Amino acid sequence: MARDTNGITPELRRQAIDRLFAERCSCVIRNGSDMRVFYERGVKDLYRLLKEEPGLLRGAFVADKVVGKAAAALLALGGDEEVSADVISRPALDLLEKNAVGTGYRLCVPHIVNRTHTGRCPLETRCDGLQTPEECLAQVTDFIETMKREG
């Protein structure tokens, strides 16, 4: 994970990771000199960025607390260069590796659990068996649209 791409040095990576925990945010995205902090739960921020600001993800370094397969798909589709996760699921790690996204993590788990810790993350379940980021994106889109309708 020590590549120096897009002007993102190891020191800048460390700053993004430190900020992730200091600010108690969901993710920090570093792209060149631009560093932005996000607070939405789940994949909402990554999904919005992919749809509305894809340039921020392209070639970026992303520090994220939890990366499941759905988040990994969004990062791969966005052209993310590298991700550092506190916790990553094995399916997410496999998908990122298949899509040449550099990956570092503290803990790799079989799957991501839901917010109430009573089962699996619903998006992790929806992405089971899917092979491509595009297939996962369709599930993420459906999930987000369903959540909006149900309010």
Where are these regions (language model features)?
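Conserved mixed alpha/beta catalytic, RNA-binding, or beta-rich assembly cores of soluble enzyme
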Residues: 7-86, 108, 113-122, 126
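C-terminal binding/interaction regions
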Residues: 78-81, 91-151
